Amino acid sequence: MKLKIKFVGFDQKEVEVEVNGQRYSEILESLGINPETVVVVKDNIPVPVDDVAEGGEVKVVRVISGG
């Protein structure tokens, strides 16, 4: 099943990957992204990175924090 990922706050704009039961965290790591530095949003709702990815479309938003 295909998952389209749109990146917000990254140089890369969009990528499509094949998912077969992987968690969002595994997909992010395979793309070189630390799952602790982003929020995954599906249907305008944040989803845990340890959820199993399904086909469709998600946004990956970079989280910036500081003190």
From Swiss-Prot:
<dbReference type="InterPro" id="IPR016155">
    <property type="entry name" value="Mopterin_synth/thiamin_S_b"/>
</dbReference>
<dbReference type="Pfam" id="PF21965">
    <property type="entry name" value="SAMP2"/>
</dbReference>
<protein>
    <recommendedName>
        <fullName>Uncharacterized protein AF_0737</fullName>
    </recommendedName>
</protein>
<dbReference type="InterPro" id="IPR053833">
    <property type="entry name" value="SAMP2"/>
</dbReference>
<dbReference type="InterPro" id="IPR012675">
    <property type="entry name" value="Beta-grasp_dom_sf"/>
</dbReference>
